[in-house]
Amino acid sequence: MATYILFWNPGISSYTRDRFICDFDEREDVGNWSFHEHEEVKAGDTFYMVKCGEGKTGIVMRGTIESRCYEDEDWSPKRRHPIYYADIETDICINPWSEAALLTPELLTAKLPDFNWHGGHSGRKLDGAMAQKLDEIWFSYLDSNPKMFSNEEAWIWDKSSLIPESVKEKLIEKRGRGCEVCGYDYARVFGPDCAGHNDLSVSPRPLKSPILKRLFYNICLNCHQAPKGKCWWIR
């Protein structure tokens, strides 16, 4: 699957600040977005949306593209033709008008200097290596900033496909292959040959609580199904 970078300047976009705030509060999707490199876009691809223009700038959304591109009227008064759009569904959204710290164009440029993170055409495709690196940077950033989810400055859907497998494996290895709640670990009991079985039973899951210093914790299925009110699973 491919990864595309979308740009949003609320100062000139038909998707205004007020529309964003309304969608953010209701946890609604923006619907669709325009793509400059539209030829190969398909359902299942990933998008990141970067806010540019005035005020705080940086990544404010990550999600999944839900359709191939289709031609429609220009969203701007310029009446350009043709303009191609694809439907998008947001998995993670951050309010740039809150106190949440964004993953800024400057930080992205320092890590991925071969892409213009400050603006330009929306809907540009990243190459595979750059897309994988961006995923690692993004989920590390989220992991280090859990308070924005507790403070309702951001929201996230707990989907099984939320974390890419390459990132998930690194998170599991980084903290050990056991559950961080109960310590459940196949390899510790049955030996290293069974380590791979943990992938089905232990995975990084997003939690929100004012006392937690990380967002993602390796949790087994049993602990993940603890009664509501006992844990802070992000829904």
PLM regions and their residue ranges:
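Histidine-centered catalytic micro-motifs used for acid/base chemistry in nuclease
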Residues: 198-205
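Aromatic- and Lys/Arg-enriched surface recognition patch
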Residues: 58, 64-125
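Short, charged beta-turn/beta-strand-edge "cap" motif at the junction between a beta-strand
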Residues: 51-56
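Compositionally biased, charged N-terminal/linker segments
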Residues: 1-43, 109, 126-146
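Short conserved catalytic/interaction loops centered on acidic-Pro-aromatic/His motifs
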Residues: 73-75, 189-196, 226-235
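Polybasic, low-complexity binding patches
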Residues: 206-218, 225-235
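Short, charged surface segments at domain edges that flank catalytic/cofactor-binding sites
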Residues: 145-191, 206-212
